[in-house]
């Protein structure tokens, strides 16, 4: 089901979401996130961007192989010191692109749709997308990172 993108001034945009409540079926939420990310031509989308108050997001991990991750209760457990500045965009801010400095490599934990916990190292674009979507869960948008 395609949902309307929440405007940045909406309350869901500015508040931290503590954890996934499991009120929604995980498979339904995962499918909704993937469907909306593809519909809006994104490489990442957080649940609160489409009006769902859950700590979850979807992201493209590998553009070349179209590998998609759906992350529930994501956490960044380690950030490496080397930072890289790149231009970022956000589906919630159409046509706005800003230079944002972020760690190039991170270690993260998240749960998948089956509640299995994963611990992975991400670098490059995958690291950046994870951090951008993670920020949405923390009530931070990319305009605050410039």
At which residue positions do the language-model features occur?
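Positively charged
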Residues: 1-146
């Amino acid at each position: 089901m395609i949902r309307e993108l929440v405007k940045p001034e909406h309350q869901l945009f500015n508040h931290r979401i503590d954890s996934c409540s499991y009120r929604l079926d995980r498979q339904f939420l995962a499918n909704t996130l993937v469907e909306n990310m593809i519909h809006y031509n994104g490489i990442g989308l957080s649940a609160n961007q489409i009006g769902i108050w859950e700590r979850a997001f979807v992201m493209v991990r590998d553009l070349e192989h179209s590998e998609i991750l759906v992350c529930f209760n994501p956490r960044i457990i380690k950030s490496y010191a080397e930072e890289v500045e790149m231009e970022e965009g956000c589906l919630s801010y159409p046509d706005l692109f800003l230079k944002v400095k972020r760690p190039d490599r991170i270690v993260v934990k998240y749960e998948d749709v089956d509640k299995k916990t994963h611990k992975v190292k991400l670098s490059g674009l995958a690291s950046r997308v994870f951090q951008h979507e993670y920020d949405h869960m923390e009530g931070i948008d990319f305009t605050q990172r410039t």
